[in-house]
């Protein structure tokens, strides 16, 4: 036989050549695609594959459908026909044991057939030999008898003739021929009879021998009976069920039958009947076998996100929601079916119910989007300009100092002369470029100062030499320490006569800011923003500190940064001031910024000039975002705008879910506070501001004004002008509208006039907070104080038919007025509190009696007045309360 190559063998068995070569290698035979393969190597490969994969058991699936029609009687004496289709399916598996048994049975049948054939041939030969012997013996007997007769005739006739002798010879030959034919015919008939009997016996054996084989094959399967027996049993059962049904529908009592049927019902049927109730109808007969398939608990792979409702968790496990709630109650957690639970709780519940939990990270898309960025890893990091944040107390000269550095008039443009935004500027000096962030110093702008400290490299702490350390100065120190950034102290207003730089050093040393000359690490520079003293020294100190820090950044690759400030411009849309920290931001880049996304349509520097690209440590205004981002959000340049949109929408939904979950969460310790919440007055406010940072600062400041009696509720807040939507929201919620550096449009003013809303404009945050305090003070419940205005001593008691007991009194102090509340004191103990009903002097009714005069006093509904009692007259005074 010619050897075949590996390539031709692969084509013959329809498998790739590489895979066949690998299989030969796994079997210990090294082959290439052009090598030949012998029969022995084929057998080695086949044995290896059988060991590796095993032989697949042969399966045989039989399906059978039987259709029948049943006439079921119904109400009204009519019967209806119901088509019934019974589907049955059996699978027979040909296991190796069954194959071996079948082979043994086949060998046994072949051996028996061979033995039978040998027995038939032997019987045939014996029958033929017996027939020949019998025929020979018969012929001999006939010949002997004939010879005997012939001898007798010869003896009787001593003279036979020659003709008689010839005739006798002819008769003897004829007799011999007839005997031989008779013998041959009998032998053939006997052989045919024996062969027919052998065929009948073989046919009977073939009908008898397969029965035990079939029974063994059926018993090897998981079915109890053969298909014929099962069909007979099913037909018998169907006939029995139909007979029972007809016996029930005939109208007879059949109490024993009903009782037997009730006993034969399964537990599940009884529970279902109990769940339906007594009013439900009797469950109709299902006309099926009473065998119920055993139920096995299915363990599923449950995929759980960061949050999931109880109903969703039940659907994932394919169970009822009540079962999940029961499992949670066993674990000590109470929940409703629509309540949102966290990932850990859902994992505990699912594992308790026997399922496998797969925790899903819902921010996989975000991680994939962030990983697919060109961040310029191969490029070397270069030196970058330091980001310097100017911090300090309000009115200590931060903006004026920066104004002198930039040689512009920024401070004069701020309302009230105080900074209310974060200003981002970069300036070119002789020694390099510096980026400045100017933060507000007012107490309301805590979060804005914290944002400035997080995005900065160096903090310049401005302290007035004549004012010293103030509350916002301490807060700025805390922000700088929290951000772990070095501090350069600028002692401002050094040109004033009352300036005391040493006092500033002493006060700052108490908060961990030690001067270099005292052994510390902070540089103290004496400056004057008005006179320009020490400005160059301050810049050199900043650059020296930056050189020590060795600030570096990668200029190539996709940019990322932070939002310093954001606002809504009427003509340009959402505008965000971004400080680039890594990479290069180009016009047309796709950016993901917190909850917002977009393509950079335009970029402008702090002077309003259009630019196309910007590197690290440079602030820039970008246009093109989907909405106004929150200040402090991280800005990242990505590749795919569609994925950026999906990530932004996911973040918005996640923020909304967390917010709702936080609102729904009710703790036991807040129960009493929630019960008394209805007694608290609420001041609803709608706030619109020019920039996001100011809006956030105002909301925080107003919410801190809330007390136990008056609560400030921010109904709506946003960036941009006051629109008709804002006015409608304020009208629906009964809120006042506060505009900070923004104005209302015509449609909003029309709604304000129609609804009579309170609309106020502000440009300084001081005024806004003070007026909100006044509005809250007007909502406070007034305080009432009791002020004693007179005392009268009872000298005698008279009886009056109209008023009862009348006390004759002497006014010892103050004034006694009629219809005022009084107290009756006996031994300095209040025994009665009521109202002065009658006041007379010399039988005349008077409205008041002054000190040192006598009078008669009638107390309403009180007659137990005695001599020596003291009547105290007082009045209730309302005291107006204010918010501290």
From Swiss-Prot:
UniProt xrefs under Pfam families: EF-G_D2, GTP_EFTU, GTP_EFTU_D2, IF-2, IF2_assoc, IF2_N
Biased composition annotated in UniProt, kind: Polar residues: 216-229
An example Gene Ontology molecular-function term: translation initiation factor activity
Major localization class: cytoplasm
Region (Disordered): 93-288
Chain segments carrying region G1: 392-399
Sequence segments annotated as region (G2): 417-421
A single Gene Ontology CC term: cytosol
InterPro entries xref list: DNA-bd_dom_put_sf, EF-G-like_DII, EFTu-like_2, IF2_assoc_dom_bac, IF2_II, IF2_N, P-loop_NTPase, Small_GTP-bd
SUPFAM superfamilies assigned to the protein according to its UniProt record, in alphabetical order: Initiation factor IF2/eIF5b, domain 3, P-loop containing nucleoside triphosphate hydrolases, Putative DNA-binding domain, Translation proteins
Span list, region G3: 438-441
PANTHER family: TR-TYPE G DOMAIN-CONTAINING PROTEIN (PTHR43381:SF5), TRANSLATION INITIATION FACTOR IF-2-RELATED (PTHR43381)
HAMAP family in the record: IF_2_B (MF_00100_B)
Family recorded in the similarity comment: Belongs to the TRAFAC class translation factor GTPase superfamily. Classic translation factor GTPase family. IF-2 subfamily.
Protein name: Translation initiation factor IF-2
Record lineage: Bacteria, Pseudomonadati, Pseudomonadota, Gammaproteobacteria, Enterobacterales
Gene expressing this chain: infB
């Amino acid at each position: 036989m010619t050897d075949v190559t590996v390539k031709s063998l692969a084509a013959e068995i329809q498998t790739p050549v590489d895979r066949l070569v690998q299989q030969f290698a796994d079997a210990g035979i090294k082959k290439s695609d052009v090598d030949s393969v012998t029969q022995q190597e084929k057998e080695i490969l086949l044995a290896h594959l059988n060991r590796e994969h095993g032989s697949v058991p042969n399966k045989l699936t039989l399906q059978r459908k039987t259709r029948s029609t049943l006439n079921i009687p119904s109400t009204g004496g009519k019967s209806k026909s119901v088509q019934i289709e019974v589907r049955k399916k059996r699978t027979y598996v040909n296991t190796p044991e069954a194959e071996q048994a079948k082979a043994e049975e086949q060998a046994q049948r072949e051996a028996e057939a061979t033995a039978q054939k040998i027995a038939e041939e032997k019987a045939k030969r014996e029958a033929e030999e017996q027939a020949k012997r019998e025929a020979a013996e018969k012929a001999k007997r006939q010949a002997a008898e004939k010879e005997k007769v012939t001898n007798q005739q010869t003896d009787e006739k001593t003279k036979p003739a020659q003709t008689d002798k010839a005739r006798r010879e002819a008769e003897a030959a004829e007799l011999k021929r007839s005997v031989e034919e008779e013998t041959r015919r009998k032998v053939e008939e006997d052989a045919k009879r024996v062969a027919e009997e052998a065929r009948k016996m073989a046919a009977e054996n073939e009908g008898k021998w397969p029965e035990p084989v079939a029974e063994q094959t059926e018993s090897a399967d998981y079915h109890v009976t053969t298909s014929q027996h099962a069909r007979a049993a099913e037909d018998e059962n169907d006939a029995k069920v139909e007979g029972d049904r007809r016996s029930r529908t005939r109208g007879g009592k059949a109490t024993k039958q009903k009782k037997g049927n009730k006993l034969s019902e399964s537990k599940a049927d009884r529970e279902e009947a109990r769940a339906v109730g007594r009013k439900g109808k009797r469950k109709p007969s299902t006309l099926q076998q009473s065998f119920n398939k055993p139920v096995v608990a299915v363990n599923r792979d449950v995929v759980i996100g960061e949050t999931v409702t109880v109903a969703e968790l039940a659907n994932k496990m394919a169970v009822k929601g009540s079962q999940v709630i029961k499992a949670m109650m066993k674990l000590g957690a109470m929940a409703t079916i629509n309540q949102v639970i966290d990932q850990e709780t859902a994992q505990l519940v699912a594992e308790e119910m026997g399922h496998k939990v797969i925790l899903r990270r819902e921010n996989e898309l975000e991680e994939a989007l962030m990983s697919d960025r060109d961040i310029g890893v191969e490029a070397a990091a270069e030196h970058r300009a330091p980001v310097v944040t100017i911090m300090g107390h309000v009115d200590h000269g931060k903006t004026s100092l920066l104004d002198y550095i930039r040689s512009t008039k920024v401070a004069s443009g701020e309302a009230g002369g105080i900074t209310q935004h974060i200003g981002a500027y970069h300036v070119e000096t002789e020694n390099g470029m510096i980026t400045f962030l100017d933060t507000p110093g007012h107490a309301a702008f805590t979060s804005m100062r914290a944002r400035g400290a997080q995005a900065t490299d160096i903090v310049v702490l401005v302290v007035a030499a004549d004012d010293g350390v103030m509350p916002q100065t301490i807060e700025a120190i805390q922000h700088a320490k929290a951000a772990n950034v070095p501090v350069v102290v600028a002692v401002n207003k050094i040109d004033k006569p009352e300036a005391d730089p040493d006092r500033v050093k002493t006060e700052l040393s108490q908060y961990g800011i030690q001067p270099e000359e005292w052994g510390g690490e902070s540089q103290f520079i004496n400056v004057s923003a008005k006179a320009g003293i020490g400005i160059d020294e301050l810049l050199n100190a900043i650059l020296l500190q930056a050189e020590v820090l060795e600030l570096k950044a990668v200029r190539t690759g996709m940019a990322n940064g932070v939002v310093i400030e954001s606002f809504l411009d009427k003509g340009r849309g959402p505008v965000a001031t971004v400080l680039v920290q890594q990479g290069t931001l180009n016009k047309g880049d796709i950016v993901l910024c917190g909850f917002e996304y977009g393509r950079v349509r335009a970029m402008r520097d702090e002077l309003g000039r259009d630019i196309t690209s910007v590197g690290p440590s440079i602030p820039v205004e970008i246009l093109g975002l989907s909405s106004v981002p929150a200040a402090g959000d991280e800005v990242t340049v990505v590749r795919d705008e569609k994925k950026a949109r999906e990530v932004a929408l996911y973040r918005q939904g996640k923020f909304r879910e967390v917010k709702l979950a936080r609102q729904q969460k009710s703790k036991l310790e807040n129960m009493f506070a929630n019960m008394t919440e209805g007694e608290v007055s609420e001041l609803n406010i709608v706030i619109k501001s020019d920039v996001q940072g100011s809006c956030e600062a105002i909301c925080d400041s107003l919410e801190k004004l809330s007390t136990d009696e008056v609560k400030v509720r921010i109904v709506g807040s946003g960036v941009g002008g006051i629109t008709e939507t804002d006015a409608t929201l304020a009208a629906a919620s009964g809120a006042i509208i506060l505009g900070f550096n923004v104005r209302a449009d015509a449609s909003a003013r029309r709604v304000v006039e129609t609804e009579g809303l309170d609309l106020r404009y502000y440009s300084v945050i001081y005024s806004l907070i003070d007026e909100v305090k006044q509005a809250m003070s007007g909502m406070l419940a007034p305080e009432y104080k009791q002020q004693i205005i007179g005392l009268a001593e009872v000298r005698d008691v008279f009886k009056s038919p109209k008023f009862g007991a009348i006390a004759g009194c002497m006014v010892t102090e103050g004034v006694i007025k009629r219809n005022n509340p009084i107290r009756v004191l006996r031994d300095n103990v209040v025994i009665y509190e009521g109202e002065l009903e009658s006041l007379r002097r010399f039988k005349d009714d008077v409205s008041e009696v002054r000190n040192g005069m006598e009078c008669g006093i009638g107390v309403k509904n009180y007659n137990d007045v005695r001599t020596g009692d003291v009547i105290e007259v007082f009045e209730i005074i309302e005291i107006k309360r204010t918010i501290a």
